[in-house]
């Protein structure tokens, strides 16, 4: 009788942008630990990670753009690149800026993602028409 093989998760290399690194550097130890936990979950689960931990940003030109919900208003915008590695694009706290945060940050995240794809020799093939950058939970309201 053949032994059942255990499936192991593919090894993913987490990538970060300078924008993300600068933001992360300004956080206290407790928030950095929360961000590290979110990144670990993203890397372990992969592109299928969904709610309540992550949600797709609808209306973005980058189909793969998602947000991770770290705590209350803290969000990470990320995407999986053409090599299926998670790219942490930027982070921020949208507390008190609920409607203004997304349009500004989504545009920046799109640019950072396209820059990343070019840097690894890929031309992003995941562009759609620009929208306003809303999560699925916002669209259902």
Question: Where are each of the predicted segments found?
Answer:
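Basic, Lys/Arg-enriched alpha-helical interface segments
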Residues: 1-74, 82-86, 93-141
